Design a protein with these regions (language model features):
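An N-terminal assembly and electron-transfer interface module characteristic of large anaerobic redox
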Residues: 1-442
Length: 442
């Protein structure tokens, strides 16, 4: 169903595919779209994802068929074949992915035929369909990962008992994805596991090729990546464990204990790791408690994020900072089945907030203004202050309108430079504490 989107917080499906390729080692995208399509998307992703920049032969450097009027009239298959051939000649990549856009889908180019013409055993080529009418960037994330992991990589003859894959964190559209993945990997390695994150600096294309050897897929999202891990289980026989991204000590300890129900982890080691990490976490946290208590920094709060961050952020604010988390806005364009999955996950996590699904920035602003009444001459009234908003760079103006403070954490995140920052796990929880209270100190 169509919906009105004002100041969007996502792109089309092609944008999601571009963001994945931007972060995935050894893979290059060949963009079969109209002139300017890939460049515009790359600029939006690069700037909106914490100014993450472009990868090698990704983003603004990616090969493109640059379809124009001639190809629209006579077809663009020959132009695509030419572009793939040239890309194979000059780019040293392990895998080439041809991604389509709206124009080339509408004129009906036979992309599969073009791919078959140029197949090279040393440089394989696959294709995906990513026009805007297939979904937004999060759908593009699922489309490209499904193609690579469930249609391209080989089936493993034998599983590695301690190897796990991480899915659900969406590169770029979760702007803190690298830091989040690093922290999850660090914790799991402390438990004796081997971890494929696919998108961190230590990963190579071999991690992609060997993903089918994993004994378990860990899905850190209530909605995104579900298609990927379900198809992965059918194709490769690998079960999955689905949960939300853990932020802070309480959520992370719970996550690790639940994980131990799905893969063999030594119970004594598990409790030792949780204890040492928790002790370190609160030893550092308590150093900030004097400043927090003396300044009376206890807030009404709201979050405006995607599905991946909505629940863990709200729970962290409520249970670890002791704030009154009133409104949780989720800005994804969710189909009914994903809406139900999100609502179910939200209802299972009690932090006293109201869940609102809305893609419209202006409507979100109006809602927050309505719930924070201005003084109309009364002697007493509840103005619900002080107020803190965790959202995107778009939401700073809304926070200012209601007399609050904002920390941008979600896409589009153009007002911060993100390299290794992440909020997942124990260390990520402390990083979030630092960022929140540094914003107040500033």
């Amino acid at each position: 169903m169509a919906c009105y989107v004002e100041r969007p917080r996502t792109t089309c499906a092609l944008g999601g595919a571009i963001a994945v390729i931007n972060a995935l080692p050894g893979v290059t995208l060949v963009n079969h779209t109209a002139i300017g399509c890939g460049g515009n998307l790359s600029g939006a992703i690069s700037g909106g994802a914490g100014n993450m920049g472009d990868g090698v032969f990704a983003g603004s450097h990616m090969p493109s068929s640059a379809v124009g009027e001639k190809e629209v009239v006579f077809g663009g298959a020959d132009r695509l074949t030419e572009e793939i051939t040239n890309a194979l000649d000059v780019i040293d990549a392990e895998l080439f992915v041809v991604a389509t856009g709206c124009m080339t889908e509408m004129i009906g180019d036979d992309v599969e035929a073009a791919v078959r013409k140029v197949q090279n055993p040393r440089k394989p080529v696959i294709s995906i369909s990513t026009p805007s009418f297939k979904g937004d960037a999060y759908a593009g994330y699922e489309i490209i990962l499904d193609a690579i992991f469930n249609k391209f990589i080989p089936k493993a003859e034998k599983k590695e008992e301690k190897l796990v894959n991480i899915f659900g964190i969406v590169p770029g559209f979760d702007p803190l994805f690298r830091g989040d993945l690093r922290e999850i990997k660090r914790l799991l390695e402390r438990l004796g596991l081997k971890v494929n994150t696919f998108f961190t600096a230590d990963q190579t294309f071999d991690n992609v090729l060997n993903a089918s050897k994993a004994s378990l897929n860990i899905l850190l999202s209530p909605v995104w990546g579900t298609t990927v891990v379900k198809n992965f289980e059918e194709v490769h026989g690998t079960p999955y464990f689905q949960t939300t991204l853990p932020i802070g000590a309480l959520q992370t300890a719970r996550f690790l204990r639940k994980l131990s129900e799905h893969i063999d982890i030594d119970p004594a080691l598990l409790e030792e790791v949780i204890k040492t990490e928790t002790d370190e976490y609160y030893e550092d946290f308590i150093r900030a408690s004097d400043t927090i208590a003396n300044r009376q920094w206890f807030f009404y709060s709201a979050t405006v994020t995607n599905s991946n961050y909505a629940i863990p952020l709200g729970e962290f604010l409520y249970k670890e900072l002791g704030w009154h988390q009133e409104d949780t806005f989720v800005t994804d364009q969710l189909k009914p089945i994903k809406k139900r999955a999100l609502v179910k996950a939200f209802d299972e996590t009690d932090f006293g907030s109201k869940l609102t699904l809305d893609t419209d920035t202006q409507r979100i602003s109006r809602t927050l203004n309505k719930t924070r009444p201005r003084n109309q001459g009364q002697r007493y009234w509840d103005n619900k202050t002080p107020f803190f908003l965790l959202g995107s760079s778009l939401d700073r103006a809304t926070a200012a309108e209601v007399g609050g403070v904002a920390l941008p954490v979600s896409f589009p995140l153009s007002s911060r430079l993100i390299t290794t920052r992440g909020y997942a796990g124990f260390r990520g929880g402390l990083a979030l504490v630092e960022d929140i209270y540094s914003t107040l100190l500033g």
